[in-house]
């Protein structure tokens, strides 16, 4: 989560809508811009462009295709450190591959050995990019490719890039945080029956634990990410539903 959001300092989508340079009030003045900010945040956070916005439902939500490039540019101008991190991460991956020397960028690192490029996560877990190569992409830039399972579920050469590497790291770190939270919950004798994205579904007697107690377990920091703002919310009911 955004650190300021986790500390209760505002609405992340409304803050992202500040890129439109006008006041934004949910269900109020310029409230429609909050939705544009939400779409931009979800679609552009990992380097997405017009195609990403469209796949997130931008056109169905009333945005026009010719205004999408302006939204993308505004989001990137409002988030220069994120954009810089995309390119710094790609550079670190490329350098590790070319030189064989470990490259650290923020809390992650890249190493290249045994014919594999490794992304080293803060938890110590590693993501593998098998048989990497540098090849020109459709835009004429050199990009990193590797062997893996594509969207057609077949083994083939895959292309990655700055934003996608950051997405890999972000989702993998989030997974590691959730996995440790699930271990803590299980250690307290609670029965996890499923998990959906960042949610845990628990089947338990009504008087075993309160929602607040379970949220506290979910919000504990693993030893490898002390200081990272974590927050959890939950509900109890007779069946699962989206809160």
How would you label these PLM feature ranges?
Residues 1, 7-243:
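Conserved catalytic core of nucleotide polymerization and phosphodiester-bond processing enzymes
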């Amino acid at each position: 989560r955004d650190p300021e959001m986790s500390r209760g300092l505002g609405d992340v989508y409304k803050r992202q809508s500040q890129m439109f340079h006008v006041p934004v009030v949910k269900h109020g003045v310029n409230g429609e811009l909050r939705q544009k900010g939400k779409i931009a945040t979800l679609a552009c956070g990992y380097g997405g462009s017009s195609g990403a916005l469209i796949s997130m439902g931008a056109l169905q939500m009333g945005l026009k295709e010719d205004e999408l490039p302006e939204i993308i540019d505004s989001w990137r101008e409002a988030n220069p450190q994120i954009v810089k991190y995309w390119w710094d991460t790609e550079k670190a991956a490329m350098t590790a591959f070319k030189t064989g020397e470990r490259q650290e960028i923020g809390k992650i690192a890249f190493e290249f050995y045994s014919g594999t490029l490794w992304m080293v996560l803060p938890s110590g877990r590693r993501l593998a990019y098998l048989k990497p190569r540098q090849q020109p992409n459709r835009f004429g830039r050199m990009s990193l490719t590797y062997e893996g399972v594509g969207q057609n579920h077949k083994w083939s050469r895959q292309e990655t890039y700055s934003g996608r590497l950051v997405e890999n790291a972000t989702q993998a770190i989030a997974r590691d945080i959730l996995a440790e939270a699930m271990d803590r919950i299980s250690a307290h004798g609670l029965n996890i029956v499923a998990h959906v994205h960042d949610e845990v579904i628990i089947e338990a007697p009504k008087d075993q634990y309160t929602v607040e107690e379970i949220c506290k377990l979910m919000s504990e920091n693993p030893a490898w990410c002390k200081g990272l703002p974590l927050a959890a919310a939950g509900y109890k009911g007779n069946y699962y539903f989206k809160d």
